[in-house]
């Protein structure tokens, strides 16, 4: 007989409302009908309780539940004994833990809701692991005995003796202004324990923000401020939860270099990051996490950087002979329309323009674009990419220059703030009534973006990633000639980013429309772009938007400004950053090839 499957039953605390339904799950359960207590609901209980030992995995309760609050997941039985933590009955559980090593940077890669932040909390000593015994949590002696013989035993012993101090840079930096008040300089002075504040501020471009109040900072400035506050404190464990969101490509690399400058033979550094090219640059070794989001997560053993990211993209763990995703994610050079189609396409032109906003001046060099083409705009924050998008959309009038062609425009802004009250379904019905039921749109956009799973939730209660997926669906669902999409990858995890890129690409090709996209995630930008528009000049002062160039020429120009070179991975063609002053880096800079399309 094959391994006996162990099941975990997950009850969603927000959705399960036994007082508002007829308890269909209990009435329809065959095990309950046989007289065993498999599903229990008392008049006092806030949510149902499902016995995982009695459950036979028939899945009837899942289909009958009116609130879609239940899910039953089969687990490979070899994981039964390796539970590290479980929040409560019928809730998420985490198996194993990543093993940090002193003097090296550990990168964690995995989708959202798979236990990365839980693992960070446990390793920081902020959450006591209960080894799955949520009703009778073990004491530390038992926990240390459990980890006996692994590197984690010494690690937890040190944490218990208060030898290790841990600092976490939180994932959601937009919450910081609620907790910290006052000028940036004052807070940095108060936290500065290592006296490295000046060099860290120079590295992260924070010097000119010292007099500004924390509540007045933009997303990218908050992110750099949060990284700086962590870097200038004295600690033994540094943890960074998504240090690159809101930052542009140049700032991402500066943040990565700053984090790597903390390396010291006695320090542990752990980074969770969804931008794979930054994670690749930052880490010395990698642990992948796989499983079912918000049901269970499993941490793999440590791999080298290249192997770890390739395992995640491939969806197969060779050491455990286990496939955790049906498809592997490969980066061929973007699929483009063939030559014959290009001749049939319409050409649109936009003129040279100039726009003054206060002290900021943006000059736009005239250019043209065709149907079925994706233009990616590359440039630092503050070079006028969003201004250009708004001028194309007709929201801003140019001060000098000709008229922009009048086109129907669909626009997804950078910051998404949900204004509508009601469910996602009502919002889709109101905004894109014809599209969201159209079979082609459902298969091209709705299914891959997993809108079905959140369609009956309140818009106000959605997380950042869910909001982003809804916003992208609304943008693509609107009939338009030009789609303007500002940062489609914000808040999405690495897997969703690649799905979103594929959805946008396929939709634009099928609909024979044009898209202008601003994107800082390098892997996503290379996958999406047919041509690129490079922005150069002095950010927030005087910048130029060049006319569209081919992917290779544009990337070379952009990367030469940043002084970074890329190579391609031979297995799945993803772009990888060369380490500063490595042989390959020096060679490519000499020959002027900052970016390779194929090796």
Residue ranges: model-predicted function:
Residues 22-44, 49, 60-77:
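Iron-sulfur cluster-binding cysteine motifs and their immediate structural context
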Residues 84-89, 95, 133-219, 233, ...:
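ABC-family P-loop ATPase nucleotide-binding domains
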Residues 101-111, 117-193, 275-306, 368-438, ...:
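ABC ATPase nucleotide-binding domain signature region
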Residues 106-109, 299-367, 371, 544-599:
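ABC ATPase nucleotide-binding domains
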Residues 213, 242-243, 250, 485-488, ...:
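Walker B catalytic motif
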Residues 226-227, 255, 471-472, 500:
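Hydrophobic anchor residue at the start of the ABC signature
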Residues 252-265, 497-511:
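Helical segment within the ABC ATPase nucleotide-binding domain
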Residues 266-272, 512-518:
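Conserved H-loop
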């Amino acid at each position: 007989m094959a391994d006996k499957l162990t099941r975990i039953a997950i009850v969603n605390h927000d959705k399960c409302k036994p007082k508002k339904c007829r308890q269909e799950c209990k009435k329809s359960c065959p095990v309950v009908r046989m007289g065993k207590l498999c599903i229990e609901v008392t008049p006092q209980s806030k949510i149902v309780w499902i016995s995982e030992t009695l459950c036979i995995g028939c899945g009837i309760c899942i289909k009958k539940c009116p609130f879609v609050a239940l899910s039953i997941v089969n687990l490979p039985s070899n994981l039964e004994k390796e539970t590290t933590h479980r929040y409560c009955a019928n809730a998420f559980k985490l198996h194993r833990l990543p093993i940090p090593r002193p003097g090296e940077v550990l990168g964690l890669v995995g989708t959202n809701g798979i236990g990365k932040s839980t693992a960070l909390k446990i390793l920081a000593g902020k959450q006591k692991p209960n080894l799955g015994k949520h009703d009778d949590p073990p004491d530390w002696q038992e926990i240390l005995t459990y980890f006996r013989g692994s590197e984690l035993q010494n690690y937890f012993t040190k944490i218990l003796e208060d030898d290790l101090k841990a600092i976490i840079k939180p994932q959601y930096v937009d919450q910081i202004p609620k907790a910290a008040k006052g000028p940036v300089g004052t807070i940095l002075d108060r936290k500065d324990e290592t006296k490295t504040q000046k060099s860290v501020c120079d590295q992260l471009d924070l010097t000119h923000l010292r007099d500004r109040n924390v509540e007045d900072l933009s997303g990218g400035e908050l992110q750099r401020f949060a990284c700086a506050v962590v870097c200038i404190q004295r600690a033994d464990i540094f943890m960074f939860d998504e240090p690159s969101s809101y930052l542009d490509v140049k700032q991402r690399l500066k943040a990565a270099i700053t984090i790597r400058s903390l390396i010291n033979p006695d320090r542990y550094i752990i980074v969770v990051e969804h931008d794979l090219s930054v994670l690749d640059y930052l880490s010395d070794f990698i642990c992948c996490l796989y499983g079912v989001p918000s049901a269970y997560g499993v941490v793999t053993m440590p791999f080298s950087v290249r192997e770890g990211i390739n395992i995640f993209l491939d969806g197969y763990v060779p050491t455990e002979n286990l496939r955790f995703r049906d498809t592997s994610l490969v980066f061929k050079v973007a699929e483009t329309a063939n030559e014959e189609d290009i001749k049939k396409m319409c050409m649109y032109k936009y003129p040279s323009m100039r726009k003054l906003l206060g002290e900021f001046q943006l000059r736009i060099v005239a250019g043209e674009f065709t149907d079925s083409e994706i233009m990616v705009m590359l440039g630092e924050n503050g070079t006028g990419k969003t201004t250009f998008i708004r001028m194309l959309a007709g929201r801003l009038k140019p001060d000098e220059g000709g008229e922009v062609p009048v086109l129907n425009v669909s626009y997804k802004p950078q910051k998404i703030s949900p204004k509508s009250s009601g469910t996602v379904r009502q919002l889709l019905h109101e905004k894109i009534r014809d599209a969201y039921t159209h079979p082609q749109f459902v298969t091209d956009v709705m299914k891959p973006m997993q809108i079905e799973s959140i369609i009956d939730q309140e818009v106000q209660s959605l997380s950042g990633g869910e909001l982003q997926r809804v916003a992208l669906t609304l943008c693509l669902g609107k009939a338009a000639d030009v789609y303007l999409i500002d940062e489609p990858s914000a808040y999405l995890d690495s897997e969703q980013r690649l799905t979103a890129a594929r959805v946008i690409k396929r939709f634009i090709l099928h609909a024979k429309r044009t898209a202008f996209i601003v994107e800082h995630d390098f892997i996503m930008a290379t996958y999406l772009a047919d041509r690129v528009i490079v922005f150069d000049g002095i950010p927030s002062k005087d910048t130029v938007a060049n006319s569209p160039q081919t992917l290779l020429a544009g990337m070379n120009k952009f990367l030469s400004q940043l002084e970074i070179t890329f190579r391609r991975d031979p297995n799945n063609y993803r772009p990888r950053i060369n380490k500063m002053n490595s042989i390959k880096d020096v060679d490519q800079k000499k020959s002027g090839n900052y970016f390779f399309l194929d090796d």
